[in-house]
Design a protein with these regions (language model features):
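Conserved beta-strand hairpin/beta-sheet module of binuclear metal-dependent hydrolase folds
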Residues: 1-36, 117-132, 150
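Active-site environment of divalent metal-dependent phosphoester hydrolases
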Residues: 52-56, 77-79, 114, 136-139, ...
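Metallo-beta-lactamase
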Residues: 72-125
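Cap/insert and terminal regions of metallo-dependent hydrolase folds
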Residues: 139-237
């Protein structure tokens, strides 16, 4: 599921099961995994993008309740007060290997006074990008995401709904600022830069319940990528898991699986 009330994405290969973010309670996480015929004990580790509660608020509970290792950068780990014995720090742009068939690259992105990162996961010669909570992007991010077979990215708000909505000006300014979130138009422009003929699927995530709507996100993004993308575009809901995308060798059971999105 993705949204302001919690975020988590499952990456599954034949030899690894990894969560990207854990913003749910332990009970909620267990319920959502059960819908995939999984338990928390099946999870090998959790990667955290940044310390905000809807992304990392449930990270410590997986350590204390199920002894699941968590990987985060140092600031994120300290902000979340993670259990030292079950925490591994990573550095931006240092490739992290999980088992023998999954590699995860953290790529820095700007967001609200946090050391936020996107992740580019590699399996079977193909790549999946998970990008959330950023108000702008860098050439570095474009370079690492371009040509990924799957891209999961936030489309947080519709500009008009945000600006004419009930939020105070200070909050509107923060959301729409360079360290805030991506609008539907920004997401469309970013995707137009990174989509290639190899890009098969896109998932739009983290839609604001007050400042966006699925049909607005989809139509706006498609306007920008219609000439460069012919694959599968889906929108992730807060109450997921909804669906899966597969990346990697066709013989693999589920090389990249994002049903918690």
């Amino acid at each position: 599921g993705t949204g302001s009330r919690g975020n988590s994405t499952l990456l599954e290969t034949p030899n690894a099961k990894v969560l990207i973010d854990q913003g749910f309670s332990g009970t909620q996480l267990a319920k959502r995994l059960a819908r995939l015929q999984l338990t928390p004990e099946d999870i090998d580790c959790v990667f955290i993008t940044h310390h905000h509660g809807d992304h990392g608020g449930g990270a410590k509970v997986v350590q204390t309740k199920w002894n699941i290792p968590v990987l985060a950068n140092e600031r994120t780990a300290l902000e979340l007060d993670l259990v030292p014995e079950l925490t591994t720090f990573f550095e931006a742009l240092d490739l992290v290997r999980v088992g023998d068939d999954l590699a995860v690259l953290p790529v820095p992105v700007p967001h609200d006074g946090s050391d936020n990162v996107a992740f580019v996961a590699s399996h079977g010669g193909e790549r999946a990008a998970i990008i959330t909570d950023l108000g702008s992007w860098t050439d570095e991010l474009v370079a690492h995401v371009r040509g990924c077979e799957h891209i999961s990215i936030e489309a947080n708000y519709d500009h008009n709904k945000l600006m004419y909505g009930p939020y105070p000006y200070s909050l509107k300014d923060r959301i729409s600022g360079r360290g805030g979130h991506l609008s539907n138009e920004q997401t469309g422009r970013f995707l137009a830069e990174v989509c290639t003929e190899t890009t098969r699927s896109i998932t739009l995530t983290h839609l604001s319940e007050k400042n966006n709507a699925p049909h607005l996100a989809e139509s706006t993004v498609l306007y920008y990528i219609d000439e460069v993308f012919t694959g599968d575009l889906r929108i992730s809901a807060q109450n997921g898991p909804d669906f899966s995308h597969y990346v990697g060798a066709e013989t693999a059971a589920s090389p990249e699986k994002s049903p918690l999105n």
